[in-house]
């Protein structure tokens, strides 16, 4: 990864670490943090709110970013592998790592978004998380915008990431 990250730094390119299977989550988080500590590049990581560990994972990234003075982007998503994670865990006799009800995933998403918003860096030299919401859920987007206003951050402190062609009316309303 070093050559890629050094080239990204040289060209001012953000490298986003994606989050896939639960089994690789801790390895992905650790690799992300170690790479960020070794090389100063524009860094981002996807984090999944459908994981029961979502709140702890958010706290881990926030604490690390503050302690190291590192600014990183978190692309907060609900998660896309619910069926796989559920079936795989049940087949192996393991606890299921994802929330079983959508309302629990939604609640975790909103808690994580609040935590990341509260850790938004206020200066260039301060560590913290810049939040990018990967969601088409109007309630979750509205809750994040309301939290921004509550803590006195401008709307520009939040990036909304939506799939092209999905929910164009919501996209328009959220951008206003």
Put a short name on every predicted segment.
Residues 1-176:
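Positively charged, amphipathic and often flexible ligand-engagement surfaces
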């Amino acid at each position: 990864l070093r050559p890629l990250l050094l080239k990204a730094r040289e060209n001012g390119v953000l490298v986003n670490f994606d989050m896939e299977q639960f089994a690789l989550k801790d390895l992905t988080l650790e690799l992300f943090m170690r790479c960020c500590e070794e090389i100063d590049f524009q860094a981002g990581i996807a984090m999944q709110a459908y994981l029961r560990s979502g709140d702890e994972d958010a706290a881990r990234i926030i604490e690390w970013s503050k302690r190291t003075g590192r600014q990183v982007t978190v692309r907060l998503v609900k998660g896309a592998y619910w069926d796989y994670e559920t079936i795989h865990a049940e087949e192996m006799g393991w606890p299921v790592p994802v929330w079983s009800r959508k309302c629990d995933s939604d609640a975790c998403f909103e808690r994580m978004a609040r935590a990341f918003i509260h850790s938004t860096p206020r200066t260039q030299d301060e560590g913290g998380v810049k939040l990018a919401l990967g969601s088409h859920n109007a309630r979750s987007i509205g809750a994040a915008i309301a939290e921004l206003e509550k803590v006195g951050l401008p709307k520009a402190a939040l990036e909304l990431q939506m799939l092209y062609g999905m929910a164009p009316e919501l996209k328009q309303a959220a951008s206003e």
